[in-house]
């Protein structure tokens, strides 16, 4: 199976909320990379490494009762957080992937620990043309579902995804022509953003 990843080691320890902002920035760039290469993924993996200060600071050490591991230098640090989340089929939608990674971050990261390293991975990556399409075949019918409303909802979702794809392509074209900082999002200007 193929994957595309992005990792970052922070210059100083970050509180979890600031680290989440950095993870969101990394995810945004990773999704644009997927779109640029014409790829889609159906699973996201997140690994978050904690800082040594969590165990060297007596106040933080007293609050931490979890597993401990050694870093490459032989120092004790809290065990890294690692998890994955499956997406609803293969996609390169910024909205869907960003929501999934944010949910994953909230689920696996200890909110009391300082963060030092982060890795975001798009897993099971395929060319968009090779991605399995959603099953448009047989559907189990029942008397209580408004199928006209369901169909409208699916059409609206498809239109929203198409609009998002056009925005992604336009952003890529601008960044290629004028440089990677030609377009900034509000999250890129928040304190702690990289």
Language-model region placement:
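Basic, low-complexity intrinsically disordered segments
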Residues: 1-194
């Amino acid at each position: 199976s193929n994957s595309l990843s992005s990792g970052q080691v922070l210059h100083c320890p970050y509180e979890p909320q600031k680290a989440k902002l950095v993870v969101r920035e990394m995810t945004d760039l990773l999704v644009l990379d997927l779109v640029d290469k014409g790829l889609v993924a159906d699973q996201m993996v997140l690994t978050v490494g904690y800082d040594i200060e969590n165990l060297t600071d007596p106040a933080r050490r007293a609050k931490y009762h979890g597993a401990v591991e050694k870093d490459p230098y032989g120092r004790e640090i809290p065990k890294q957080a690692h998890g994955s989340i499956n997406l609803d089929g293969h996609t390169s939608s910024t909205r869907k992937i960003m929501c999934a990674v944010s949910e994953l971050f909230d689920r696996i990261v200890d909110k009391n620990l300082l963060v030092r390293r982060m890795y975001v991975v798009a897993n099971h990556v395929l060319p968009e043309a090779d991605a399995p399409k959603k099953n448009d075949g047989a559907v189990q019918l029942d008397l209580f579902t408004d199928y006209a409303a369901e169909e409208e909802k699916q059409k609206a979702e498809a239109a929203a995804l198409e609009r998002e794809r056009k925005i992604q392509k336009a952003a890529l074209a601008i960044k290629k022509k004028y440089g990677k900082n030609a377009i900034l999002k509000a999250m890129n200007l928040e304190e702690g953003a990289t």
